[in-house]
Amino acid sequence: AMLSACEPSVKAPEAILPVPEQKQIDWQKMETYAFVHFGLNTFNDREWGYGDTDPATFNPAKLDCEQWVKTFVAAGMKGVIFTAKHHDGFCLWPTQLTEYCIRNTPYKEGKGDIVGELAAACKKYGIKFAVYLSPWDRHQANYASPEYVDYFHKQLRELMTNYGEVFEVWFDGANGGDGWYGGAKDTRTIDRKNYYNYPKIYEMLDELQPQAIVFSDGGPGCRWVGNEAGFAGATNWSFLRAGEVFPGYAK
C-alpha cells in the first residue's frame, strides 16, 4: 500500500474536443430555471403579435413579481428568463427608444417596469435573472434596414446596463417575415447570418455582462436543441460551430 502511494501521479490526458468555459459549467450546474413568456399577447390570445396591438390592452393590475419568484424558489428553480420584448416589438421596460412600450399602457399609470420589478424580486429572493430579447421586430418601420440594427443594439445595451447582473441572454431564431412594420403591412427578409452584426453584440456582452451565457440556435454559450420536443443527441448536444452559426442561422 505504501509503495502504491509513492507512485508518480498520472498526467491527465490532453483534451481532444473543445472544453467548456467556466460560465458554461456554471450554467449547467443551475439545472432548472423558469421562463416567463408574458406581454401584450397574454391579453390578446396570440402566440406571436403582429406588431399593431394597442398598448392600452395591457393592464395586469394584480401583477406581483414577488409572487412569481417565491413560486419559482418553492419549486427549486435557480433563476428565471423574462421576455423583455417578443416579436411584436412591445417592450416591457420603459425604453427611451420607442413609444411602443410599457410607458404607454394603463399599468401603474404608465410608471411600471416589469423587467425592473422582476429583476428586483429575483435579487430579493436570491435567484438569478435573465432576459429574452427578440431580434425580429414586427412593429418597427425600419426593420430590415441598417438603422434597425442600431436600434436593436441600443435596446440590448439598455437591458444590460439598467437591471443588474444577468445570467443569460436569449436570442430567438425567428427572424424576418410578415409584420405591421409601422403600417407598411408587408413581408421582409434579412441576411440572417450577417444582418444583426452578432460579433459586435458579443463584444458588448463581454464588456457589460461577461458572466452571461448567450442562448440561441447558434449559441455561442448554449444552443437550441434543434426541436421543440426536447430531444437531443446523446453525445453532441452541446457542441457548437463557433463563428459559423449564429442566432437565426444554425446551418
Tell where the protein language model's regions lie, with residue ranges:
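C-terminal motif of bacterial Sec signal peptides marking the signal peptidase cleavage site
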Residues: L3-A5
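Mature catalytic domains of secreted/periplasmic carbohydrate-active enzymes
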Residues: S9-K251
